Amino acid sequence: MTNRLSYRRRGRAALATAVVAAAATAAGLLAAAGCSSSSPATNPLTGQGSGGHVLAAKIDNVGAAQTQLSGLNSADLVYVIQVEGGLSRYLAVFDSSTAPDVRVGPLRSARQTDIPLLAPFGRVGLAYTGAISGLLPELAAANLQNITPAVAPKLFSNGGSSPTYLQTSAVFSAYPNLAETQNVGFQFGAAPDGGQPAASAAAQLPGASFAFTASGQKWLVSVDGRAATSSGQGRLSADNVIIQHVHVVAGKFTDHNAGHADNEVFSQTTGSGQADFYRGGQVWHGQWSKAGDTSPTDYTVGGATMLLAPGRTWIVLEGS
């Protein structure tokens, strides 16, 4: 993928206009009245530690960004999502207990897929640099606290032609009423019977390949055949890997940023499909189902709930 294709969307930040800023400010005031004062005793996103307030961040993973990643090994969850032009992005989910003060980035633009994907989490923060103009009203109307350079410029570092980052501590301080970790469908426990030995897992998106190599109880992440790392954190790793097979369809919007039309795509995470579950050097083949946008996702094998290993989970939304 050329540098032009990899980086031509930095201009999206300018599109995060006052329509999102005004809605985000009003929504933040409303959220303060409905947020609980105590965190879950056990984090329902990881099955370990205590829960906290939730921040999701849209993160670049193309070209030079692969050597600029920061904070991913502090995430509770990392989603890999296809976007236009065959590219992909990470949607990383952090909580204030697990990642109280972590540098996160490089940040990129929000997409249509993010809204229903995050709907079960409640009114969490979504940090991104901008969005295509047609999507801005939907982001403003969504049950999300939009956090962008247009809304809160002091929370972001660099920007423009340079990678954009934020510090989780600054976000949690500025937005103390973000929704706390809650059940979005993950269940944790001892590995179920029926797993098959697996030394690695692989997923293919149009513009990138992802591999996860078993190393003890962990899975080490590689992208396009190269070891993936996070600044100051070493090799990217997961305790669980889910390859979630979804329908990827044409999105509602067309991007005209680089002088030509580029159709956005939408990964359907409401519905059902096949899923492959990797934990502890084994694989199980099963299903996922989600009744509605705000419903938890059920992960099953042979009709029984698939139990994950406590820890961080990577979920690749692979087109079926």
Describe each model-derived feature in a short phrase:
Residues 27-48:
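C-terminal region of N-terminal signal peptides and the immediate post-cleavage residues
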Residues 41-77, 84-320:
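A surface/extracellular/periplasmic glyco- and lipid-processing/surface-interacting theme
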Residues 2-23:
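N-terminal export and membrane-targeting signals
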